[in-house]
C-alpha cells in the first residue's frame, strides 16, 4: 500500500476543492494514484459536492416525529424552494429524521458524519448544496407538534393538557414566535439589555431620570409578557392569554422548540446581470 503523505492530500485538495478526509479516503482507495483518485471523486460526485459546499443553503424543510413521550425536530437545508419539494431531497430528510429519532441523536455533527456519503451523492444529483443544519428533542408527559407547510415546525412538551389543546398552542407558537415559556423565564441578560434600550428612549424624551425609570418598569412588565408564551394573547382566543387558557384546563407547558427554515442564515440574492456575469467567468 502506498504511503499517503500530507503533501499528496494537500495537492488533491487544491486540485478538487474537496475536504481533507474525502481526499485522504480517495487516495487510500486509489493506492496513492492522484489521477485515479480525481477520476473516482468525479464519478462519486465528491468534487461537484465540494464546489457546491460554498453555496448558501437557506431553504429546505422542517420535520418532526413523536412517539410516546419522546419527540424530535429536524431542519435540513437546500438552496431553493424548488429542490425543497423534490422527492429525493424529501426522502433524504425523512431518512435523517428516522435515524436521529431511532438513535435519539441530538448532536448534528454525528448526523452529518453518518449521512455524509448520501449527502454528497444527492448534491451531485440535484446540483444544490444540502446541509443537515440542526436537530433537537423533547421528552414529556404530553407531546405535540405543528408544521406550517414544511417551513415552520414546533415541538411542545406539556402536562395536564389534551392533544387538541397542545396542537392549538403549538400553532400559536408557530404564529407568535415566543422566545420563553413564562415571563419569569426571560433571562437577566435579555431583561437588562431591553431595560437599557427603553431607558435611553425615555431619557431622550426629556423626562427626569426618576420618572423615566418608573416608566421603564411598566414597559418591562409588558415586554416580558410579549416575549413569553404564557404572557401572549392566545391566537385562537385573543381575549385571553395563553397562560389563562392553560390555567382553565389545569395544564402547563414545560418547554417548546420552534424551528423556521433558514432563520439566521444570510441568503445571498443575486440580480440577473450579476448571475450572467458570474456564469461568464465560469465558462
From Swiss-Prot:
Stretches assigned to coiled coil: none
Point out the signal peptide segment. Answer: none
List localization entries.
Cytoplasm
Instruction: Extract one GO molecular function annotation from the record.
Output: translation elongation factor activity
**Gene Ontology CC terms:** cytoplasm
Write down the SUPFAM superfamilies for this protein, in alphabetical order.
Elongation factor Ts (EF-Ts), dimerisation domain, UBA-like
Query: Which InterPro entries does the record cross-reference, listed alphabetically?
Result: EF-Ts_dimer_sf, Transl_elong_EFTs/EF1B, Transl_elong_EFTs/EF1B_dimer, Transl_elong_Ts_CS, UBA-like_sf
Q: Which Gene3D superfamilies does the UniProt record give?
A: 1.10.286.20, DNA helicase RuvA subunit, C-terminal domain (1.10.8.10), Elongation factor Ts, dimerisation domain (3.30.479.20)
Role noted for this protein = Associates with the EF-Tu.GDP complex and induces the exchange of GDP to GTP. It remains bound to the aminoacyl-tRNA.EF-Tu.GTP complex up to the GTP hydrolysis stage on the ribosome.
Q: Which HAMAP family match?
A: EF_Ts (MF_00050)
NCBIfam families, from UniProt?
Answer: tsf
Designated name of the protein = Elongation factor Ts
Q: Which organism is it from?
A: Serratia proteamaculans (strain 568)
Give the taxonomic lineage as stored in the record.
Bacteria, Pseudomonadati, Pseudomonadota, Gammaproteobacteria, Enterobacterales
Query: Gene of origin?
Result: tsf
